[in-house]
Amino acid sequence: MKGCKMPLKHILGADHVVITVRDLDAAAAQWRKLGFTLSPRGTHSPQMGSGNYTIMFGEDYLELLGVLHETEQNKPTREFLKNREGIERTAFTTDDAAAGAADLAARGLVPLGPVHFGRPVDLPNGGKSEAKFNVFRWPLSESPGGMRIFACQHLTRNTVWIPELQKHANGASRIVAIEILAADPRGAAEHMSRLIDEPPSVADGVFRVHSGGKRADFVFYDAAGFAKRYPDAVRAGAAPEGAAALVIGTSDLAAATKALGTTGIAHHGMVSAPASAANGTVVSFVAQ
């Protein structure tokens, strides 16, 4: 019926955040210094042309992503890296990539995919397996606040959520928020809301859109709001616009503070690693 839109019943909340970097191994070393346990380095299927390290939590995770060779699939990532490193995109969990892409098409959007790919996995017991995925992307023009979004169907969760990789010296347990710097935070939040069917809210001039379920929030700031939230020393090296910060829940804030050492800056009830220490991304820890 004209004027109606299909519900996005196959989008289940934020799945993982992609931090795109120029030197994958150097980035891994930086994030280990923040107290994270990283997976062994992975190499995606040839058509993707990328490699990664993952930082696994309870239901979500971070992905450090690097380009290994040029392909059509990684062209947007290469364009992103011409300007900066940092949070390039966020994935949502989908239980059916084909159906999710069809839901977008029913709304008049042109999804990219689904695309099937995988990567070999070295298991803690010395064995080998494979992680397999189906993904689809919203059109590149639909990037709220400058952050691309896509959806990921995990076909082999047991080769991604490995218990030994979910234990971190900093106590990290989940992604609480993905924070986005936008000239028009209200407009960016409303854009995200339209794309994922989650209502926006506002408090003290800060706009928020929940990603779904018990997963992370997207929080949108203008430059003044971002400067109020983070001291100058924390914002050093952060992106001037787009996704700029992560808030990570920790079961032990003292452990997170210890893991960060002299890199950490305590403020507003949290402890933050400056963007200069995390590939252009402010990484903050809050007690959960």
Where does each model-flagged region fall?
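Glyoxalase I/VOC metalloenzyme domain signal
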Residues: 2-14, 19-39, 57-117, 123-288
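Conserved catalytic-core motifs of GNAT/GCN5-like acyltransferases
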Residues: 38-46
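Short acidic/glycine-enriched loop/turn segments that link adjacent beta-strands
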Residues: 47-49, 269
